[in-house]
């Protein structure tokens, strides 16, 4: 498999993200196919099956367990890679603990796997290697670059 990586520059690029190894990067590339198939990261997360299922009736909207659509192996690999990333990066760790305090730890793990899938998608789509300061979004700029005015103070 390592010889196959030399022929796949996208796999090498995805492996620059902490926690993402050869198997995860290769599976992500092969399952997704091409990033142009998807308009946004939300569609990638839905394709992989890392979004909640929805049961709606009238005005009632209930979000259930993850949809589990898509490749089960890729979903498993993304959850494992997200756990490795959480152990090695303080920003990811703090985000995980913030989610785990509000919800169960398993739900927080899946949320971090979804975040990883979206992050890998944007790295691939924009042709960038991982950078620790890099916050990728659909506009291709830092997500936290806007200033919000609230009651006379700036956040």
Task: Describe the predicted segments one by one.
Residues 1-155:
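A detector of single, family-specific signature residues
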């Amino acid at each position: 498999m390592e010889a196959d990586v030399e022929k796949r520059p996208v796999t090498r690029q995805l492996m620059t993200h902490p926690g993402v190894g050869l198997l995860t990067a290769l599976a992500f590339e092969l399952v997704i196919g091409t990033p142009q198939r998807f308009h946004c990261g939300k569609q990638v997360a839905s394709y992989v099956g890392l979004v909640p299922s929805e049961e709606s009736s009238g005005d009632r909207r209930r979000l259930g367990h993850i949809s589990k659509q898509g490749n089960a192996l890729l979903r498993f690999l993304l959850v494992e890679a997200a756990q490795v990333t959480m152990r090695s990066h303080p920003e990811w760790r703090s985000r995980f603990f913030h989610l785990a305090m509000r919800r169960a730890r398993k739900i927080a793990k899946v949320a971090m796997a979804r975040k990883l899938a979206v992050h890998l998608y944007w790295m691939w789509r924009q042709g960038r290697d991982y950078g620790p300061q890099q916050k990728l979004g659909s506009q291709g700029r830092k997500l936290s670059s806007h200033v919000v005015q609230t009651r006379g103070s700036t956040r």
